Amino acid sequence: MIKSFSMSGQRRDLNREKFKLDNLLSVLISPESNANKNLKCLRNAMDVRSELQQFHPCSEMKCLSKGRSDIVVIKRSKGPESVFAIHNMTENKINYQLNDNDLPKIIDNELNAQDLLTSTKYNWKNISLDPFQVIWLSAL
């Protein structure tokens, strides 16, 4: 790495790992590798996102977590069709209660929301997030 830095003079080359194609492919296709698991999660997220009109670039977007450093909550779209992207930004498990003007119109049972990424069901008033977890909630 230092050799490529000294040749190019570009700081970005200092810590850039050089991959061998065969090694990289074997890691990516190995079901137990973190790279494979991460790639599957990213593919799933992109597939889900491509199907949701709420994630259209022109769709309304609002940050509901202003002033917080532990969680980011982004509301996409308006009304009962809204999707709430909730990101735990910490290495700790946290609990969160979602409050938004559109919620009273759609809360009607205990498990009233679903994560579009995993199909896990939640209650708007008691959302538990693992460290660095991301969920995309919509009403059931």
Please state what every model-predicted region is.
Residues 25, 77-78, 90, 100-102, ...:
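A broadly conserved detector of short glycine/acidic/proline-rich loop/turn motifs that flank catalytic sites
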Residues 93-117:
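Beta-strand-rich binding/interaction modules
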Residues 68-69, 86, 103, 131:
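Low-complexity, intrinsically disordered short peptide segments enriched in small/polar/basic residues
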Residues 1-83, 89-95:
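Loop/helix patches that line or flank the sugar-binding groove of alpha-linked glycan CAZymes
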Residues 120-140:
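C-terminal beta-strand-rich structural cap/linker in extracellular carbohydrate-active enzymes
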Residues 74, 85-87, 122-128:
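Short amphipathic beta-strand/extended segments with alternating polar/hydrophobic composition
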Residues 19, 96-98, 122, 127:
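Generic detection of short hydrophobic beta-strand segments and adjacent strand-loop junctions
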Residues 45, 86-88, 113, 132, ...:
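Hydrophobic, well-ordered secondary-structure elements that form the walls
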